Design a protein with these regions (language model features):
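Bacterial N-terminal signal peptides that target proteins for export
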Residues: 1-12
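Hydrophobic small-molecule pocket/channel-lining residues, especially in calycin-type beta-barrels
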Residues: 4, 23-160
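Generic secretory/membrane-interface signal
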Residues: 9-11, 20, 134
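C-terminal segment of classical bacterial N-terminal signal peptides
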Residues: 15-23
Length: 160
């Protein structure tokens, strides 16, 4: 094979697989930053919707640190934290009445699937998608809350 053809072939392989290689090598997490719930674009079933929620993702030596703060529909505070990796293993959540562990796995550069557990039992699943322009984060969640009430929510967040 001549040198030009080989160079073109290597370039094509890198162009098509480069994203996967960068992702596997620990590319920057596109969720990093502060995200505010857009109530007008979100749907909470059966509801009611929270009054406000802010999610902050930060990179740390231990993985991705997530802090969630807000105000529930009844006026009570929402505040929980977790530090996790996208490796499918369970990581502790502190402060949530609904979950005590979280496991997450990347589907692709913009999508993550997560499972939430309480006392070792799966109580929720979430798909997190970040828009192509990186300014909208959507969480599609199904599961049961601490009272056993089923929910099917789509929460849309705007990057700040």
């Amino acid at each position: 094979m001549n040198k030009i053809v080989r160079t073109l072939l290597v370039g094509a392989v890198l162009a098509t697989g480069g994203g996967a290689v960068a992702l596997a090598a620990g590319a920057p997490d596109s969720s990093v930053g502060t995200w505010t719930l857009n109530l007008a674009k979100s749907k909470f079933s059966p509801g009611p919707a929270p009054k406000s929620v802010t999610r902050t993702y930060a990179e740390s030596a231990q993985g991705t640190a997530l802090t969630v703060n807000g105000v529930a529909a009844d006026g009570s505070p929402i505040s929980w934290q977790a530090t996790f990796k996208y490796d499918g293993k369970d990581y502790s959540i502190t402060g949530s009445p609904n979950y005590d562990t979280l496991s997450s796995k990347r589907v692709n550069a913009s999508t993550v699937k997560s499972t939430q557990k309480k006392a070792g039992k799966v109580v929720g699943t979430t798909t997190r998608t970040i828009s192509a322009h990186g300014k909208v984060l959507t969480l599609s969640s199904k599961g049961k809350d601490a009272k056993g009430i089923a929910h099917d929510d789509v929460a849309v967040y705007d990057k700040q």
